[in-house]
Amino acid sequence: MSFGHGRLQTETPFAAIINGRIIGIAYIRKSDYYPLPEIYPWVSGIFVTESYRGHRISEKLISFANEYAKEKGFDKTYIPSVHTGLYEKYGYRYLGDIVNYANETDRLYVKEI
């Protein structure tokens, strides 16, 4: 498995690739689906193909994204989610509830990197 990233001005995508197939993705974004311009960078868009779930791919993608953010001079990252208990195992702590542009409530997590 290999991990790669592309460079964009407002977001940087990361992909987990096996045998030339993308099996997982994550992004570092300057902004996300929330009216919170003072909070960034976001680790978001985390997805792993169902057949590869349970193999710690998302953990590796998040770690890779955090290392990239750290190299860029950031000391923390944020993850928005509806899940409870998922990102805590990756070192994130619950910061509070946030409301997205669709007026839906999500949980905001932060991690010192």
Task: Please identify what each model-predicted range represents.
Residues 1-17:
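Active-site rim helix/loop that mediates acceptor-substrate recognition in acyltransferases
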Residues 6, 28-36, 45-48, 62:
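Portal/gating segments that form or line small-molecule/metal binding sites
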Residues 11, 104-108:
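Short hydrophobic/aromatic beta-strand or adjacent loop that forms the aromatic wall/cage
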Residues 13-15, 21-31, 42, 47:
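Conserved beta-strand in the GNAT
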Residues 17-19, 111-113:
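Active-site beta-strand termini and strand-to-loop segments that position acidic
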Residues 45-48, 54-67, 79:
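Conserved acetyl-CoA-binding loop-helix of GNAT-fold acetyltransferases
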Residues 71, 75, 81-105:
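Conserved active-site alpha-helix within GNAT-family acetyltransferase domains
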